[in-house]
Amino acid sequence: MTKAPVAPVVLVILDGWGYCEEKRGNAIVAAKTPIVDSLWAAYPHTLIRTSGKAVGLPEGQMGNSEVGHLNIGAGRVVPQELVRISDAVEDGSIALNPALVKICQEVRSRNSKLHLVGLCSEGGVHSHITHLFGLLDLAKNQQIPEVCIHAITDGRDTAPTDGVRAITMLQNYIDRTGIGRIVTLSGRYYAMDRDHRWDRVKRAYDVMTQDGVGDNRTAVEILQASYAEGVKDEFVNPIRIAPGAIEPGDGVIFFNFRPDRSRQLTQALVSPTFNGFERQQITPLSFVTFTQYDSDLPVAVAFEPQNLSNILGEVIANHGLNQFRTAETEKYAHVTYFFNGGLEEPFAGEDRELVSSPMVATYDHAPAMSAVAVTDVAIAAIQKGTYSLVVINYANPDMVGHTGQIDATITAIETVDRCLGRLLESVIKAGGTTIITADHGNAEYMLDDGGNPWTAHTTNPVPFILVEGEKVKIPGYGTNVELRSDGKLSDIAPTILEILQLPQPPEMTGRSLLKTADYELQRTRTPVQVGL
């Protein structure tokens, strides 16, 4: 006997689609979004929090894609690495960290160099400059003879020219403590690529590993000259400032805590099977990463991963149900690795499909990105009728929003809106439920108070829309479904479990966003017409 098709819950994550009533610099308000507008008018909706303590970050700290997907998938507020490491720096326990102490001992015994590599930024998304200061203090206490800093500039999670401020802070700390020197400078566009654009990574790798005469200017002077040429922090050309190449026998600490944009450079430096570009492996090389970038890398890890049990994907799998994940390259790790609590391997019954992102320098040149192809893949999965949960990420609002180009971001938003229309038609035909939300804000705030481009994330809430192909009915409440107004990202997984009529495990401490506890799916419903 043929099984009846499964009516899925489809979770659509509009990456970087925040909510803000201010119209100035708001690409979402400026865009024509008839699909989202009609859904917001016709279906239960609310706003949820995606920043600060609501997602395990310090109060006032903007959220990001890693944190967002981690909280969504875990169904609980997950203490973030930023907080863990900052606490270790503040209370001094970083000085006792076994992996960090060991690498210092190895460097000292060989009388070699210690290299500190990472994003010099106050953004708090991939790193924090205070963590670098903590490492300098550690190196001084460990009496390391030579400390070389390979500084990566931000301009994406911070203002485009905040690099001067960050590098000035760093140089002042070096001068005050008397340890360390900045030996290379590189924009994150090169050193932190995550899309296998190995030509970019190679440029950063080469300046870090090939010694030679340095530039006779200071790091700040180099940045100021770069700005004068229209090249801001993110895109600063890799440059050697002073002697101090990474050589055999040295030690390296990569102090970024977010894995996705740290993985490729680390692979180039340590992997014996690396083939992204031609290079001579540096060996022996002691190497510590702040967090686990990839379980297959031959490195020590300073802050081991937290083990999260009974997360959404695991619960779905444990009940014998199938699930599907898709996104384009830029956000694929988020709907897989991060959504699964930092696990690389899929759960039983979990299928995935990666859609390649377009090969362009920046996504304002291709604001549609691969949204149409992602939609095609998702529709095909829904039409199979075997998946109880389908998770989709649309990267456009975030990735194009990061360019600071408002017109291109408007195009990106409108592209996603059209794709949503097609997607929803397939969910309705399947008798499923669609949840439309976001992981953090971005595209709704693209100009700062001074009218300058804002390319970072925001602390704004994001929309949450519950869309049934047929109107939701709750016993005793008819079609009057209400959603809580105090929700956060960790409440999404419990909501999905309630819709699927699956028990919520005790480890999952989020609360369903449905105000009523006796929500049930009914076979007989009154169709609602939305302008699709």
Swiss-Prot record:
EC number: 5.4.2.12
Binding site for Mn(2+) 2: D15, S65, D439, H440
This protein's pathway: Carbohydrate degradation; glycolysis; pyruvate from D-glyceraldehyde 3-phosphate: step 3/5
Catalytic activity: (2R)-2-phosphoglycerate = (2R)-3-phosphoglycerate
GO biological process, one term: glucose catabolic process
Gene3D superfamilies to which the protein is assigned, alphabetical: Alkaline Phosphatase, subunit A, BPG-independent phosphoglycerate mutase, domain B
Binding site for Mn(2+) 1: D398, H402, H457
HAMAP family per record: GpmI (MF_01038)
Protein name: 2,3-bisphosphoglycerate-independent phosphoglycerate mutase
